[in-house]
Amino acid sequence: MERFKNDIERLSSVRFDDVDALNEQLHTHLGEPTRQDVMDERIAGHGMLGDLEVRNIRLRSAADDPALANLIFEIAPPSIALKEIIWENSTKHPPRPDAPGSRPYWSAQVNDAKVVLGLDSDNVTLTYISISQR
């Protein structure tokens, strides 16, 4: 678990407007940006975060300020189990009862980024990661 924590901390400290650094951290190649209204989006099919295979990697950033960005990707099976708090300021959120299909997740402030660790319906299996820099 310590390695996973370090991998997330390292990734969240990379400036998201430095696409080469993100490609290196995720062992991938984010494609050229496509414009979606006021956002630019770069996509990669798969990569690695430490020992975890990741897929459906998306980097969405403000067209006028690429440092304001959200990086989101899925974790390919087999994943890892998050049974306990990782960072001191972590909060576990239950599924929303008013939202069908809603799943639990952990959230934490890591470096200057908001990190969300999405869980499967079993409340422990990591399914996706979202990192937002503002």
List where the protein language model places each region.
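Short Gly/Thr-rich strand-loop-strand
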Residues: 86-109
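Short, exposed beta-strand-loop hairpins at the edges of beta-sheets
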Residues: 106-130
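Sterically constrained small-residue positions within well-ordered secondary structures
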Residues: 50, 62-64, 99, 108, ...
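Short, surface-exposed coil-to-beta transition loops
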Residues: 52-55, 68-70, 101-103, 110-114
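Short helix/turn-capping signatures at newly exposed starts of structured segments
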Residues: 1-93, 133-134
